[in-house]
């Protein structure tokens, strides 16, 4: 029976320390080899937390699958901010263009509850509310109203 370890690691910067080392050590595999491969596979997500799944079979062979970072991490990277606002209703920390929200929605579509791109984009824009990030210079709630009215349907065709 294969053992499975699921962790969030910093993209391209995983180490043999927690959370990976303690989880992989008891399985008797080369932790450094696993860490090196994870860092190769997650290098493009530098600076973001990335979900990683390591499967180890009975013969100590391992396979690594890398997920897509959380929506908040993708939005913050696009906005160029380190963390969201502590007061999202009053303090704005960044802005993302609607096109970036569409791109993020396309990346995350399989993991979302939405059935179509328009609603997935609304989920991403809704996440911007709690981060204190505007969308194309507008408050996220105003952008949601515009999306509902069909004002951006040309961008949302996917």
From Swiss-Prot:
GO cellular component, one term: large ribosomal subunit
Keyword field contains Heme: no
Origin superkingdom: Archaea
Keywords: Ribonucleoprotein, Ribosomal protein, RNA-binding, rRNA-binding
InterPro entries, per the entry: Ribosomal_uL11 (IPR000911), Ribosomal_uL11_C (IPR020783), Ribosomal_uL11_C_sf (IPR036769), Ribosomal_uL11_CS (IPR020785), Ribosomal_uL11_N (IPR020784), Ribosomal_uL11_N_sf (IPR036796)
UniProt cross-references to Gene3D superfamilies, sorted A to Z: Ribosomal protein L11, C-terminal domain (1.10.10.250), Ribosomal protein L11/L12, N-terminal domain (3.30.1550.10)
A single GO molecular function term of this UniProt record: structural constituent of ribosome
GO biological process: translation
PROSITE patterns per record: RIBOSOMAL_L11 (PS00359)
Assembly: Part of the ribosomal stalk of the 50S ribosomal subunit. Interacts with L10 and the large rRNA to form the base of the stalk. L10 forms an elongated spine to which L12 dimers bind in a sequential fashion forming a multimeric L10(L12)X complex.
Function according to Swiss-Prot or TrEMBL: Forms part of the ribosomal stalk which helps the ribosome interact with GTP-bound translation factors.
Matching PANTHER family: 60S RIBOSOMAL PROTEIN L12, LARGE RIBOSOMAL SUBUNIT PROTEIN UL11M
Similarity annotation: Belongs to the universal ribosomal protein uL11 family.
Entry protein name: Large ribosomal subunit protein uL11
Organism: Methanospirillum hungatei JF-1 (strain ATCC 27890 / DSM 864 / NBRC 100397 / JF-1)
UniProt gene name: rpl11
């Amino acid at each position: 029976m294969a053992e499975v370890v699921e962790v969030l690691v910093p993209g391209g910067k995983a180490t043999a320390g927690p959370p990976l080392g303690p989880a992989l050590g008891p399985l008797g595999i080369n932790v450094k080899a696993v860490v090196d491969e994870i860092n190769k596979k997650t290098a493009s997500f530098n600076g973001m937390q990335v979900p990683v799944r390591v499967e180890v079979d009975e013969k100590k062979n391992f396979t690594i699958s890398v997920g897509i970072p959380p929506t908040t991490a993708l939005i913050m990277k696009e906005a160029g901010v380190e963390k969201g606002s502590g007061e999202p209703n009053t303090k704005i920390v960044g802005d993302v263009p609607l096109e970036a929200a569409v791109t993020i929605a396309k990346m995350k579509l399989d993991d979302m509850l939405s059935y179509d791109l328009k609603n997935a984009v609304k989920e991403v824009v809704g996440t911007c509310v709690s981060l204190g990030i505007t969308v194309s210079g507008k408050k996220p709630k105003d952008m949601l109203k515009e999306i509902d009215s069909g004002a951006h349907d040309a961008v949302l065709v996917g």
